[in-house]
Curated annotation (Swiss-Prot):
UniProt keyword Disulfide bond present: no
GO cellular component: plasma membrane
Name of this protein: Uncharacterized protein AF_2132
Transmembrane segments: 5-27, 37-59, 87-106, 116-138, 159-181, 196-218
Membrane topology according to the record: Multi-pass membrane protein
Lineage of source species: Archaea, Methanobacteriati, Methanobacteriota, Archaeoglobi, Archaeoglobales
Broad class of the protein's primary localization: membrane
Source organism per UniProt: Archaeoglobus fulgidus (strain ATCC 49558 / DSM 4304 / JCM 9628 / NBRC 100126 / VC-16)
Record keywords, A-Z: Cell membrane, Membrane, Transmembrane, Transmembrane helix
Length: 244
């Protein structure tokens, strides 16, 4: 298999990993019936193929290739191994010890239990998530050069981001000021939005700990990261409502 085909295959695997990961977060375990599992397995490759094709086409339009992305990916994998070891011994060990103490002394509240269970879920699925995140981080390193050639498009993306943030802010304010029972048509969306944003914040925090996206934020690449996260929030909310 030549390098071009391998890069395309790896891109598909990365896209598939991200989509399946968000499906796992979006759908409650009790809703994972056999027919829905089959539906996820059938739908996810279709989205992964479309996403991989669009990414490949986008890079080719600007004179780049997937192979350049995978060169950057090799360095990210080396960084991940180092950051993962540091994460386990510096961050996870104290958290596990603190959790054991809280549990032993009987102060294991539902909120703490939910947080630790979500933390454990993210950590257990982190290899799957890392496969996708590493690819997108490498692509962003290439995209940083692409963005300089398309300032008009970048400005449009920033405007689009602020519009979405304004809409989300209005939704949050309206939820605080108006009880959901008074707006029954928005109850499902409110719940899905809260769950989706909360889980995405946990994912962002975990990746900042890993040091993968953390370094990118430090290099002022936050707008494009935000641009990628907003479509994920929207799709996440849609899946939550669909599978509720």
């Amino acid at each position: 298999m030549n390098k071009g085909k391998f890069a395309l295959l790896f891109t598909f695997a990365a896209c598939f990993a991200v989509i399946v990961f968000f499906w796992l977060l979006a759908v409650p375990p009790e809703n994972f019936t056999a027919d829905r599992i089959v539906m996820v397995l059938l739908i996810s490759p279709i989205f992964a193929i479309l996403l991989a094709f669009n990414l490949s086409r986008f890079l080719k339009q600007h004179g780049y290739s997937l192979r350049q992305v995978h060169v950057a990916l090799e360095q990210n994998i080396a960084d991940f191994i180092y950051e993962f070891q540091r994460l386990v011994f510096i961050h996870l060990m104290p958290i596990a010890f603190l959790g054991a103490l809280i549990f032993y002394y009987g102060e294991f509240t539902p909120a703490i239990a939910e947080f630790l269970s979500l933390f454990a879920l993210i950590f257990a699925l982190s290899p799957l998530l890392f496969l996708g995140i590493s690819f997108f981080v490498a692509m962003l390193q290439v995209y940083e050069r692409v963005r300089k050639k398309s300032l008009l498009r970048a400005n449009f993306f920033n405007f689009w981001i602020w519009i979405h943030l304004f809409v989300i802010l209005l939704i949050i304010i309206s939820k605080v000021l108006v009880q959901p029972s008074e707006l029954p048509f928005q109850k499902a969306y409110f719940k899905a939005l809260n769950d989706g944003v909360f889980n995405l914040l946990i994912i962002a925090t975990m990746n900042a700990i890993f040091g993968v996206t953390g370094r990118m934020v430090a290099r002022e690449k936050f707008p494009i990261l935000l641009h990628l996260s907003i479509p994920l929030v929207n799709s996440f909310v849609a899946v939550k409502i669909l599978m509720a």
